[in-house]
Regions:
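Long, contiguous binding/interaction regions
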Residues: 113-119, 124
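Short hydrophobic beta-strand motif reused across regulatory alpha/beta modules
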Residues: 33, 45-50, 91, 103-111
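Short amphipathic alpha-helix segments
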Residues: 135-147
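Bateman/CBS regulatory modules and CBS-like beta-alpha motifs in cytosolic regions of diverse proteins
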Residues: 1-26, 37-38, 43-46, 57-84, ...
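Extended, non-globular alpha-helical segments
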Residues: 53-55
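N-terminal, positively charged regions that mediate nucleic acid binding
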Residues: 27-33
Length: 147
């Protein structure tokens, strides 16, 4: 399961000439805490709501800051994307080509949906948890218990 299969391009991006006020409004409209900043379709950084609120003048343009820029390439496995989103508490993760060209994003919500599907969380059934000491572990005993 690769990231390229779950990319969305429906979310807005920021440009260096956008204002902090505009970026905050976009984040509020789309219920996001982060938005990617692009320059000529090249991913530059991930702008957070926290960074924008810390701006002395929210009506000033964002410019081309060198900030935090996490991203994954299109051929990255979904687990690596999940690890980054979890580690940095991101609302979305930009996806780029090998040349750094912006391809879209994968959202935290989409990653949770994928994880749920992988774990069969929405399927009816049961989960058995067996606590066994390592020296007592025997696959035949476990199979007999399950039968």
């Amino acid at each position: 399961m690769l990231v390229k299969d779950f990319i969305t391009k429906e979310l807005p991006v920021l440009k260096s000439f956008d204002t902090g006020e505009y970026a905050l409004a976009l984040m509020d409209d789309f219920k996001l805490k982060h938005l990617p900043l692009l320059s000529e379709n090249i991913y530059r950084c991930l702008v957070s709501e926290k960074d924008l609120l810390a701006m002395p003048d929210p009506t000033a343009i964002i410019g081309d800051p060198v900030l935090f820029s996490p991203s994954v390439q299109e051929d990255t496995h979904i687990y690596e994307a999940l690890a980054l989103v979890t580690r940095y508490q991101l609302s979305l993760l930009p996806v780029v080509s090998t040349e750094g060209e912006y391809r879209g994003v994968i959202t935290r919500d989409k990653l949770i949906d994928i994880l749920s599907e992988l774990c069969n969380a929405d399927t009816a059934g049961s989960v058995f948890v067996l606590e066994v000491m390592p020296q007592d572990y025997s696959m035949t005993d476990i199979a007999r218990l399950i039968e």
